[in-house]
């Protein structure tokens, strides 16, 4: 059975509205190509039915919070945090790094999820939305949840793009961080640095060499805090 490591309903928000497909931009800067969201990040039977059901419940709990425009209550904050932790761990790259084998992944996912969730609730108690304006946009990728550190600061932010126009970040801070470049460029470069093979976008004109240059200039190294 084909199973998704990135929730299809969320990835659909990155479809090109004219093509109804997502643009896949290879990390090695080869020519981009488009595919339906339902055909991306699928793998055959990489997890057990029980684990698939456990993860589906996480995605279901998060759905109302994603739709809400106002401030989240405690239950909604928990649901969004669970979704972020799920997508931090479940992608193909993280599975290679966190687990020794597919069997190890299926046996230990729940315990690793709970461990990372507890750390996240402690270290990232505040969630903020950032809305992109004008022609700026956010990308996502096959490692959708990234952790970045604003230049000159010690604390990390955990971020993911909800859509091409909305970024969520989790932190322990009450003020938004300041960046020397547009937050869209900084986050997109971090998404590029963190991805395994592909950056995903609703646009064909994402410039991968530019993202690679920004990642080098700011010494962006993907990290998961422990």
Locate each region found by the language model:
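Alpha-helical structural context detector biased toward long hydrophobic helices
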Residues: 1-226
């Amino acid at each position: 059975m084909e199973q998704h490591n990135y929730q299809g309903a969320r990835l659909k928000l990155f479809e090109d509205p004219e093509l109804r497909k997502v643009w896949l931009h290879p990390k090695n800067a080869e020519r981009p190509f488009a595919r339906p969201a339902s055909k991306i990040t699928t793998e055959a039977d990489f997890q057990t039915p029980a684990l698939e059901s456990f993860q589906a419940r996480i995605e279901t709990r998060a759905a109302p919070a994603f739709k809400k425009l106002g401030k989240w209550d405690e239950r909604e904050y928990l649901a969004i945090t669970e979704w972020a932790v799920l997508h931090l761990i479940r992608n193909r790259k993280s599975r290679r790094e966190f687990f020794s084998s597919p069997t190890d992944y299926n046996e230990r996912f729940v315990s690793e999820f709970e461990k990372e969730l507890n750390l996240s609730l402690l270290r990232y108690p505040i969630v903020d939305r950032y809305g992109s304006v004008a022609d700026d946009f956010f990308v996502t990728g096959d490692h959708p949840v990234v952790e970045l550190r604003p230049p000159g600061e010690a604390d990390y932010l955990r971020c993911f793009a909800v859509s091409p126009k909305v970024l969520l970040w989790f932190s322990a801070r009450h003020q938004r961080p300041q960046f020397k470049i547009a937050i869209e460029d900084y986050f997109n470069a971090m998404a590029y640095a963190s991805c395994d093979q592909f950056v995903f976008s609703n646009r064909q004109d994402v410039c991968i060499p530019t993202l690679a240059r920004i990642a080098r200039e700011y010494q962006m190294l993907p990290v998961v805090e422990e």
